[in-house]
């Protein structure tokens, strides 16, 4: 009976050690991926586009929260990778970065005429209130 308990405790300890090492490996891989993404030459444009999307979704183009986020992201990029230009990038990451700039959210800022067409075809329904009246859709009378 004691032998089975000892075996079970040994097996349980081994499982915990394996799980711990797997978690550490996953965290290391995640950190490597974050470093590769943030050192990519198009990373600054990715941040800029993301912040533009946040501006549209919030409806407040001069939001201090968004500006603080922009400052924080810029500082973290500078502090993490001061010499990022020498690092090689993968083709999958290159493809992602390039395709991101053709996303619907980017089109909102680059093509004002298609703003509503883009918003109507988002996979999720989004209620947006824009700052300027020319961007507000007419509401149905009840």
Curated annotation (Swiss-Prot):
SMART domains listed in its UniProt record: KNOX1 (SM01255)
Transmembrane segments: none
Keywords carried by this UniProt record: Coiled coil, Cytoplasm, Nucleus, Transcription, Transcription regulation
Pfam families linked: KNOX1
GO molecular function, one term: DNA binding
Superkingdom of origin organism: Eukaryota
Gene Ontology biological process terms, A to Z: leaf proximal/distal pattern formation; positive regulation of DNA-templated transcription
Keyword Zinc recorded: no
Coiled-coil stretches: 4-36
Tissue specificity: Detected in inflorescences, seedlings, leaves, hydathodes, stems, roots, embryo and siliques. Expressed in a polar pattern in organ primordia and at the boundary of mature organs. Detected in the lateral domains of flower meristems, but not in the inflorescence meristem or the vegetative shoot apical meristem.
Name of this protein: Protein KNATM
Protein's organism: Arabidopsis thaliana (Mouse-ear cress)
């Amino acid at each position: 009976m004691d032998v089975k308990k000892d075996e079970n405790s040994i097996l349980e300890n081994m499982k915990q050690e394996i799980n711990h090492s797997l978690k550490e490996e996953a965290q290391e891989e995640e950190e490597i991926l974050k470093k590769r993404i943030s050192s990519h030459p198009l990373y600054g444009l990715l941040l800029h586009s993301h912040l533009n999307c946040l501006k549209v979704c919030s409806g407040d183009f001069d939001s201090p929260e968004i500006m603080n986020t922009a400052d924080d992201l810029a500082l973290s990029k500078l502090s993490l990778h001061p010499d990022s230009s020498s690092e090689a990038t993968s083709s999958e990451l290159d493809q992602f970065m390039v395709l991101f700039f053709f996303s619907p959210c980017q089109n909102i800022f680059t093509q004002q005429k298609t703003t509503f067409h883009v918003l109507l075809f988002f996979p999720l329904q989004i209620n947006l209130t824009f700052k300027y009246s020319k961007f507000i859709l007419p509401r149905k009378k009840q």
